[in-house]
Amino acid sequence: MPVAITRQVSPAIGDCELTHLERTPIDVDVARAQHAAYEAALAALGCRVERLPAEPDLPDSVFVEDAAVVLDDVAILTRPGAESRRDERPTIERALAPYRDVVAIEAPGIVDGG
């Protein structure tokens, strides 16, 4: 059974990084409902959803696909250009370690997933 790793929405998601979009307020309750629907869709497709807890101090951490590039045999932990994203790495590494060998991009390298 495929595994889908997700993370609950941070209460600080309204402070997330945006690079080119005009900011409109994010309704945390709506974001949580949308994320629950996303997880339900993954489960309906046959995935076992492994949900990580929210990271209250990491607004962007719900976007787990940015923290690693996962291939068949290895997971590559990214080193995002935004310093605010780099503290997401330890929990993603722990979540991926049971499923893949894990390697990491180190300074001065920069890789953004997604």
Regions found by a protein language model. Give the residues of each.
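The feature marks the mature, well-folded catalytic cores of soluble enzymes
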Residues: M1-G114
